[in-house]
Amino acid sequence: MPALIEIEDICKVYNPGENEVRALDGVNLKISKGEFVAIIGQSGSGKSTLMNMLGCLDVPSFGQYFLNGRDVSTMKDDDLSDVRNKEIGFIFQGFNLIPSLTAVENVELPLIYRGISKEERKELSVKALEIVGLSHRMDHKPAEMSGGQQQRVAIARAIAAKPPVILADEPTGNLDSHSSKEILEILKELHKTGRTVILITHDNDIAAQAKRVVRIKDGKIEQDYLNDDTESTK
């Protein structure tokens, strides 16, 4: 299967020169369409920097990043913004919902920037909320929902436009164990429908929910293995 994401020898260097810091140091990674991959590492490992690269929130100092066949590693800010809007659905630890908007309005908001008509925006948003089990909460504002429900709204917002990549950064970090389990089950169900899911975490138990685990340490990929076959793929 051709790679949806292909990173070639990527480095991210801060303070070049005598006191330089290599947050990423020669990272190579391929992710195929439809994979469910967990990227795990402790604080300072480089996982957040790698997430920023994968999400087109930053560009590498060296190396190339191909997303859906396009080299995004040298794109300007406006072009990267367009890629983020069309190619990637983000789920963050903080739900990032607008308090004054209802659930369906929060889900609709990013679709406006894609130039989608009002009728289609509503249809896509309602469908996304149904997928995450919140059809009964569409007209509720964030303050009227639990943390787990708010994160489900955030997932609906990420998937509404059907982007090729779902990028989830510590999506259970602010949730209790019950809500965390619900969110992980939703991500698994999304993967079963053929969506590409990339989960960023520091937690081994959460990483174990993915089909593939990529461990990063000191800016390098330390391990890359399948959860149902622990033999390293490197």
Regions found by a protein language model. Give the residues of each.
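H-loop (His-switch) and adjacent beta-strand-loop-beta switch element
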Residues: 213-225
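ABC family nucleotide-binding domain
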Residues: 2-216
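ABC-family P-loop ATPase nucleotide-binding domain
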Residues: 1-13, 223-234
